[in-house]
Amino acid sequence: LRKRNYLNNKDILSEIHRSKNTFCSYVDNELHHQFDIIVSSVDEINKDTVEEARKNKAKRLSTAEYERRKMAGEKVKQAECEVSPDSITKEELIFRVMTFDHIPEEPGRKKNPKTIADTKVKLNFPPFQHFKYNEEDEIICVGKSHWQGGMENGSFSLGHGKATDKLALMWLKLVDRYATRGNVRGYTYNDEMKGQAILQLAQIGLQFDESKSDNPFAYYTAAVTNSFVRVINIEKRNQNIRDDILEMNDMNPSYTRQNEGEWEASVKRNEEASHSSFTDFSPSSED
């Protein structure tokens, strides 16, 4: 039976990109939304990064062409769809620069700011700008995150975008699948754990930084795991408090507490029995 892939990094990355684009403004949405390389500053745009960006763009175009022809029903080899990096001009490349330059400051948001992000408005994902070479070989800004309007006459905006419906469905699917794992599916508060995990993904789902990793599935799984464990720990603490109150009032605690007590007592009895049988045994001496 063929194994079915219900979620993969490629699809998740694509939806994260589309979701972030709803918070961005570009000079030309079709030409400037897709970045070819991520750098930390404009100073890093040089000959080496240009060559790397060419290779990245060629690989992406080759894969897209292969999938397009395959979907059209053609019997085609991937080698036939290869795009040469040399065929891509420098002016076609888009550089994503991770920067806070266009984000307004918010003094006092953090008592002891440690990074530049602590001095700026709180954002739903790391901010960036898109740059490219123009015909005069100058590097110009063609896109900004958390922005509305033109590059020069636009304004900062935080609430005009949203996660795509497909990305939201991916979050729900991931939580549903995680909730069926053997170590969590038996809990009576399984729904509370799922709700907490969905809330967590809605809050941090777009904070995934493509410049640091290309594995959003692991990022999301870790967030879901933390949410489930947090609810389990809270419920266990509440149950222990409830059982303590019941025992203080000479009432029977939960079956979990009773079973734990019986188990601990049986373990103790077995240990004492094995210890006494060992010490009482004395081999007979031969004359």
Where are these regions (language model features)?
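Short alpha-helix-to-loop micro-motif enriched in aromatics/charged/Gly
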Residues: 181-189, 201-223, 234-236
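Extreme N-terminal regulatory/targeting segments of RNA polymerase sigma factors
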Residues: 1-189, 261-262, 277-287
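Intrinsically disordered, low-complexity, charge-dense segments enriched in Lys/Arg
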Residues: 240-287
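A short glycine/small-residue-enriched secondary-structure motif
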Residues: 147-151, 195-200
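Long, charged, glycine-rich C-terminal linkers/tails
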Residues: 189, 194-196, 245
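Active-site/pore-lining binding-face segments in mid-to-C-terminal subdomains
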Residues: 219-251
